[in-house]
Amino acid sequence: KKDGVLWIVGGPRPSTESSRLDSLGARHLPSAGHLDQATSEHSPAEGYLLGDTLCCGLPRKIVATNIPQSFIDQFSWPPVEIHDGILPDRFADFAAAQAPGGFDDIIVLDPTPEILDALPPVLAPGAVVNLVGERPLGRPVRVDAGRVHYDYVVYVGTRGPDISASYGETGNRAEIRPGGAAWVIGGGGPMGRMHLQRMLEMQDGPRRILVSESNLVRNPEITADFGPLAAERGIELAVLNPRQMPPHAYEAAVADFRGAGGFDDIIVIVANVTAIESAMPHLAPDGMLQIFGGLGRGTMAQLDLSNVYLGHAQITGSAGSTIRDQGAVLDKVFISQLSTAAAVAAIGGIDAARDGMQGLMDGRFPGKMVIYPQVESFPLTALADLRSAAPTVYDLLGPRGAWTREAEAEFLRRFAGHVYE
């Protein structure tokens, strides 16, 4: 991050008698020659290259811990502050002293489980954690799923030696993989259906989509509402209900659908740590796991992040769209590349707003509820129930009962006295 604080941390290194310790237990090495002597026997991060890591802007501060001088010498500016000997149990105190708001970027060379377990509390909002190494972790580590979702914390990685391979558009992506396999966990609700609609209408989207949904009402609606569109686009669509299958059978069905290569994209809509943890083993070597479910900050998931650097996988999240993103969505709607109306499940007037909020919390409808403030009095009504509540509006619904511009115009004409062109 430009003008941010970058921390580069490696595995443990031996101390020397001539080094001095500060109040945090950090070892300050007075010279490059001394540092080379201290690390000549054991340099876990030896051989890595900086590459184009700083091509997009310089951090205002760079801190290094347990990193060989040969790597530090690749930085020309700003000067690297060396603080060796910081153990994971002191990371929080170290971050408070060096980056009170958290580190904007952390590069971990040859990561260990102990190092990664200690990282969540020291990350700034929007932090990027770049893992670089060739040895698997051997066990899951702590990942703050809530901060990945709400604070846009990202985990990327590479085997090396060029650590910049983790960055940029070629190093990590922000879009569904064309022609790949995608898995939407919790795909029967409003947000899941929007993800599904978008993937099915993408010009170059996935060729195979698996949807998991445990709601007995929503589950069959997925196939009914999206099956025809998937067939039209030549996309394989399958729906599983984990509550209707023994755990081992469900896992086997997921594995059978994904095949040997794994899922290129896994989007976890449900706010459930177990769903995130169980999804990780099904991720392709260079796949992307997106945490979309609204888990609170501090909610820890246990994930084996070895695949992040050994296979170039990504862990990312989103809590919603920026204004710019919303503009991009509208552009797709205007050129008929995205049918947002298909997500509408119920409508109501302004007096139904409270009922709509309660319906949202109760999961009453599988799709979105639209409240029209210019309509003073109309109860929250499922589109299917417009047959009796507003027959002339119902008659203008689209295929499979989808909301349409014509139906909206008739609704406003009848109940708001508004002519909508």
What spans do the regions from the language model cover?
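Rossmann-fold NAD(P)-binding glycine/threonine-rich loop
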Residues: 117, 133-152, 277, 293-312
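Residues in the short beta-alpha loop(s) of Rossmann-like NAD(P)-binding domains
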Residues: 12, 65-68, 135, 212-217, ...
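A short helix->loop->beta-strand "cap" motif at the edges of active sites that frequently abuts
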Residues: 4, 58-60, 124-128, 151-153, ...
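Glycine/serine-rich phosphate-binding loop and adjoining beta1-alpha1 elements at the start
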Residues: 1-3, 8, 124-180
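C-terminal hydrophobic helical "lid"/dimerization subdomain
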Residues: 1, 18-57, 66, 70-78, ...
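Short beta-strand "acidic-cap" motif of Rossmann-like dinucleotide-binding folds
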Residues: 61-64, 131, 208-212, 291
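ADP-ribose/adenylate-binding Rossmann-like module
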Residues: 105-110, 123-140, 265-270, 281-300, ...
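Conserved beta-strand segments of alpha/beta enzyme cores
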Residues: 81, 154, 208, 236-238, ...
